[in-house]
């Protein structure tokens, strides 16, 4: 029986997601043995700087992709929102299982709702996407960046000068946190999720047909369509961690509705549109074209240039 080496980051969430997917493969009868190899990524090592200041997408995947190239591992389970829109040559997404909750979770001291936070309240997030959208609704809030895994951030809420923090609902749910810890889930209308938020992407070598055949059995077609549309939009916009960019699609199997957002980091400018269609790639590109005509692409390039100059 072939032994499959699975690459994973060392965080509790990453290992939980990896082991969950391995168990799904076993339940589906995949004819493999499995071993997990833990890999430290650049994003795991840099904890004292905002991610937007140390590079774009890929901070949590490059070392893992290198291990795939060198055949140290056979596949990796990623939080898909961490994956660059364009994969390196020779690597593919072999499976996207059903999506978990794509929303953002708002967690505050004393369970004070977002709309009831006092002026000047401090909200912790490491995401430019979240901060820009929060400031659009509540420009009177103070955004303070926060890094670390889920447990670390929840601890910081209790011990440091934060009135609230924002986390991905999917991570909380996968780790088994009770919904009691969440003050409220932010609607996608108020806080559009990151591209592919809540989805897992299983990355492997494109020539590993034996493995790809088994991975394909666990793909959820609706989630695949949604992720494809969102990632096509991200790729066309040349977006990354340096710019607030969001994309969220829903598919009923025939029709895909895709909403995209690009904003200035200080929320002074926000571009947001929705398109509907049946072809995931086409509507992702169509949405990018619409926002580009409005000025979103120029904004992205300008913000990137400013970041690179610092």
From Swiss-Prot:
A GO BP entry: protoporphyrinogen IX biosynthetic process
RNA-binding is among the record's keywords: no
Subunit structure as annotated in this protein's UniProt entry: Monomer.
Record note on cofactor: Binds 1 dipyrromethane group covalently.
HAMAP family in the cross-refs: Porphobil_deam (MF_00260)
Top enzyme class: transferase
Enzyme Commission number, as recorded: 2.5.1.61
Catalysed reactions, semicolon-separated: 4 porphobilinogen + H2O = hydroxymethylbilane + 4 NH4(+)
Organism: Lysinibacillus sphaericus (strain C3-41)
Obligatory cofactor(s): dipyrromethane
Name of this protein: Porphobilinogen deaminase
Pathway in which the depicted protein is active: Porphyrin-containing compound metabolism; protoporphyrin-IX biosynthesis; coproporphyrinogen-III from 5-aminolevulinate: step 2/4
Family, as annotated: Belongs to the HMBS family.
Other known facts: The porphobilinogen subunits are added to the dipyrromethane group.
MF terms (GO), sorted A to Z: hydroxymethylbilane synthase activity
UniProt entry keywords in alphabetical sequence: Porphyrin biosynthesis, Transferase
GO cellular component terms, A-Z: cytoplasm
NCBIfam families in the cross-refs: hemC
Function: Tetrapolymerization of the monopyrrole PBG into the hydroxymethylbilane pre-uroporphyrinogen in several discrete steps.
Residues with S-(dipyrrolylmethanemethyl)cysteine modification: 241
Superkingdom of origin: Bacteria
